[in-house]
Curated annotation (Swiss-Prot):
GO cellular component, one term: cytosol
Subunit structure, as described in the record: Dimer of large and small chains.
Keyword Iron among record annotations: no
Record-given protein name: Acetolactate synthase small subunit
PROSITE patterns per record: ACT
Gene: ilvH
Organism, scientific name: Bacillus subtilis (strain 168)
Family: Belongs to the acetolactate synthase small subunit family.
EC number: 2.2.1.6
Molecular function (Gene Ontology), one example: acetolactate synthase activity
Highest rank taxon of the organism: Bacteria
Family matches, as Pfam families: ACT_AHAS_ss (PF22629), ALS_ss_C (PF10369)
Sorted UniProt keywords: Amino-acid biosynthesis, Branched-chain amino acid biosynthesis, Transferase
ACT domain span: 4-79
Length: 172
């Protein structure tokens, strides 16, 4: 089962390595990781999209993550109302004669062309993973040279009451 787990951590060298080591040790496949600064100086947010077997595995993983010294908060936001986004850059084979056609394909996705060369264009698209996958499928017939994706980043929408199913543990 796919889970979205967010962590706030002290921004220090080696923190990400120790955290990913826990996933490796327990044989969990990490689909994506995003890391960035937060509104608080010296604190970063990490968003993991990870595959686990069941609820017990999620609880065990959450407990193990919270034992890490530099981890401030761990939240499994999978079942919450969340805002999630991913960015993809897609380099597509494009002769000048096909550019208008490709622009017609990317427009409904609110994607944009961010680079043009003689034989290719680079398309930028943001949104949920399924939206990005759909655009990639439509662009495949033209020939995709490269794809770079950021991975999912997410957090809970607005102010939410904590449901009993939310797995939020904070150690500060």
């Amino acid at each position: 089962m796919k889970r979205i787990i967010t962590l706030t951590v002290v921004n220090r060298s080696g923190v990400l390595n120790r955290i990913t080591g826990l996933f490796t040790k327990r044989h969990y496949n990490i689909e994506s990781i995003t890391v960035g600064h937060t509104e608080t100086a010296g604190v970063s947010r990490i968003t993991f999209v990870v595959h686990v077997e069941g609820e017990n595995d999620v609880e065990q993983l959450t407990k193990q993550l919270n034992k890490q010294i530099d981890v401030l908060k761990v939240t499994d936001i999978t079942n919450q109302s969340i805002v999630q986004r991913e960015l993809a850059l897609i380099k597509v084979v494009s002769a000048p004669s096909t550019r208008t056609e490709i622009n017609g394909i990317i427009e409904p996705f609110r994607a944009s062309v961010v680079d043009v060369s003689r034989d290719s264009i680079v398309v930028q698209v943001t949104g949920e993973s399924n939206k990005i996958e759909a655009l990639i499928e439509l662009l495949k017939p033209y020939g995709i040279k490269e794809i770079a994706r950021t991975g999912t980043t997410a957090f809970a929408r607005g102010t939410q009451q904590k449901a009993s199913s939310n797995k939020t543990i904070s150690i500060v």
